[in-house]
């Protein structure tokens, strides 16, 4: 936050205590079907083996740029193994509800959802609907030009949605296939 000033300050404080730091990110999608990127700062009192900047998944370009902008910080990189994304998708975890379950949106709410989709989102939904098997995707509401619209994720994972005030935003779950579509709020 604050253009990297908070991170630079935290690393400098760790450096002042004698720690060298490694920085890397982990995304939950490497373990479960959810995208949730987190930054890790690992401090060591011992000198770390220098690994350069391998594995762009763990150390994206923005992280390298941060380190380049702060040459005074003691940052060294650990040799971390590459991570393979999880093969799990929403279908492996989604709670199966019968069509009669009250949590599915009624026709009126479904129609509002469908009419709020952009042409690209409508095409995405039509492709899912045309499949012979049921599939699941998450959708989230955004405001575009003062109008609420729904966007359906193209992958089979859920996102980590944050509101401008720092809280979480709810996701909808789209179930489509065999010519049908149903939508409801995501459940545990």
Where are these regions (language model features)?
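Cytochrome P450 core scaffold surrounding the K-helix E-X-X-R motif
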Residues: 170-174
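Acidic glycine-/aspartate-rich tracts in secreted/extracellular proteins
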Residues: 48, 166-167
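Short Ser/Thr-interspersed hydrophobic loop/turn segments at strand-loop and sheet-helix junctions
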Residues: 160-166
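Low-complexity, glycine/alanine/valine/leucine- and proline-rich hydrophobic stretches
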Residues: 175-188
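Class I S-adenosyl-L-methionine
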Residues: 1-153
């Amino acid at each position: 936050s604050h253009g990297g000033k908070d991170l630079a300050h935290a690393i400098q404080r760790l450096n002042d205590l004698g720690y060298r730091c490694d920085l890397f990110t982990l995304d939950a999608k490497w373990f479960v079907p959810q995208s949730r990127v987190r930054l890790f700062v690992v401090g060591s009192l011992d000198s770390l083996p220098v690994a350069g900047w391998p594995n762009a998944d763990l150390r994206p370009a923005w992280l390298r740029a941060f380190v380049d902008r702060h040459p005074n910080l003691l940052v060294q990189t650990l040799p971390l193994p590459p991570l393979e994304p999880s093969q799990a998708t929403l279908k492996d975890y989604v709670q199966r509800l019968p069509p009669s379950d009250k949590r599915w949106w009624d026709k009126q709410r479904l129609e509002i959802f469908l009419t709020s989709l952009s042409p690209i989102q409508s095409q995405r939904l039509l492709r899912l609907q045309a499949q012979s098997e049921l599939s699941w995707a998450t959708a989230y509401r955004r405001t575009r030009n003062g109008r609420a619209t729904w966007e359906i994720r193209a992958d089979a994972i859920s996102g980590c949605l944050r509101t401008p005030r720092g809280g979480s935003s709810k996701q909808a779950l789209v179930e489509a296939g065999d010519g049908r579509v149903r939508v409801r709020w995501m459940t545990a």
